[in-house]
Amino acid sequence: MAIAIGLDFGSDSVRALAVECRTGQEIATSVEWYPRWQEGRYCDAPNNQFRHHPRDYIESMEAAIKTVLAELSEEQRAQIVGIGVDSTGSTPAPVDAEGRVLALRPEFADNPNAMFVLWKDHTAVEEAEAITRLCHQPGKADYSRYIGGIYSSEWFWAKILHVTRADPAVAQAAVSWIELCDWVPALLSGTTRPQDIRRGRCSAGHKSLWHESWGGLPPAAFFDELDPIINQSLKYPLFTDTFTADIPVGTLNEEWARRLGLPQNVAISGGAFDCHMGAVGAGAQPNTLVKVIGTSTCDILTADKATVGDRAVKGICGQVDGSVVPDFIGLEAGQSAFGDIYAWFGRVLGWPLDQLAATHPELKPQIDASKKQLLPQLTEAWAKNPSLDHLPVVLDWFNGRRTPFANQRLKGVITDLNLATDAPALFGGLIAATAFGARAIMECFTEQGIAVNEVMALGGIARKNQVIMQACCDVLNRPLQIVASDQCCALGAAIFAAVAAGVHADIPTAQQHMASAVENTLQPRAQQAQRFEQLYQRYLQWSKSAEQHYLPVATPAKTSAEKPATLTH
């Protein structure tokens, strides 16, 4: 027997999962919430700032692994062969010469700019737009060619430029920046120094403008033209080589072996983004669109290199050789908000209840119980009477739009209301909106010649809310496979750990032994699909019209060229 542990670093918590490598049996699992994040520290939601303190990751990871190990027998603990890591992304942080995230140093302990900039942080909209403009200058190389043609404020270089401009102290102290999914394996293996870190193909290819065809990162002149402050503060290039996640970065170092009570020969596999590993954990095959559904969605599809050819798919979040499965092109898309939209509506409806609880504390237990039932009751009420002929049409841009064609300036829009629109109908409109966003992504692939043969959904919403999933199935007008495991991302990380440890020869072989089964396959209902088709066309019309209201206002180019002094470390 051999056991692998998968670590899945999400937006709110980290999950550890122990998996038997020959059978795929999920033996033990634990979820630990990030304590500082739970307190709302280092975030400024109205200004789209969301930061994670590295100690949240370290403390929660250690607790989660120890809880899992406590559930294993002594014999099972001795059979642990590898640890794999996935995380949200792009979630980068500035590090010093030893690879310490700056927030781990006393002088930066409470500085949000010295922490991990969470994927959904949208403080770098202007910087992202500047990168996109530079990529599209006539007569120059387009370094956005393989990331969909638009650089997002959620991504690596936009965040680096924003923080470097905003915080000279951080810019002075930072020797490099690193993605969370690369930092955790480096931490566990003791390879955190910038020159020792193995950069993952997944994060580098999808978020950092890295591509083999131009030798890695864009040339130094590209960053000089974007803003000289980047090359003044960071040594060019930050990195050159990248590695697929099946390649081990090392083994458990002495400190972490002691802290966890594990031997130092435990292999540490390379890191990747959560949804890419989730697709592997789901057992997805080429040309299967995998929707990893949570607060937002990430949509993953793999395709044979020969099928993709030299085609550059526009409007997505990148196409990268080996970002999901080695030797296949991994294509990424996603919705900036899915479950977050439902949660927003729950907060809106819950506001009067909060006020009542504040004035009548004795009622708080009953009020809290009622609030928990708001969304389930709305779902049930809408399912009984969906009234598709009178459904509000909603644009699902409550947190901007990731795909198709990223635009984080966009806002949610609700249309077609009348005096008969009640709470269940409005909630139904939100459900339909998230389904319409899913279809727009699928069509972004198919209309550019990338076949979608099957569609899979995974995650808590996929398994627990059939009403929402059936609406997605009807809108897509495709069978929708619901994956059995609700921890596919951690399962995928464990699969990569098993390959890195040598238990399986490659990822496809490991998937045959370890990947999740399909729990249920939903079928589209003809009548509902026909009505949703009409609503989807309305959604497209409103999308085209509304987007014009969020065009950026022309401003002089922002640059730090007036500060030419080179920063030293």
Swiss-Prot record:
Reaction it catalyzes: D-ribulose + ATP = D-ribulose 5-phosphate + ADP + H(+); L-ribulose + ATP = L-ribulose 5-phosphate + ADP + H(+)
Signal sequence bounds: none
Cellular component, GO, one term: cytoplasm
Molecular function terms, GO-annotated: ATP binding; D-ribulokinase activity; ribulokinase activity
Keywords: Arabinose catabolism, ATP-binding, Carbohydrate metabolism, Kinase, Nucleotide-binding, Transferase
Pathway this chain belongs to: Carbohydrate degradation; L-arabinose degradation via L-ribulose; D-xylulose 5-phosphate from L-arabinose (bacterial route): step 2/3
GO BP terms: L-arabinose catabolic process to xylulose 5-phosphate
Family assignment from sequence similarity: Belongs to the ribulokinase family.
HAMAP family: Ribulokinase
Protein name as annotated: Ribulokinase
Organism from which the protein derives: Enterobacter sp. (strain 638)
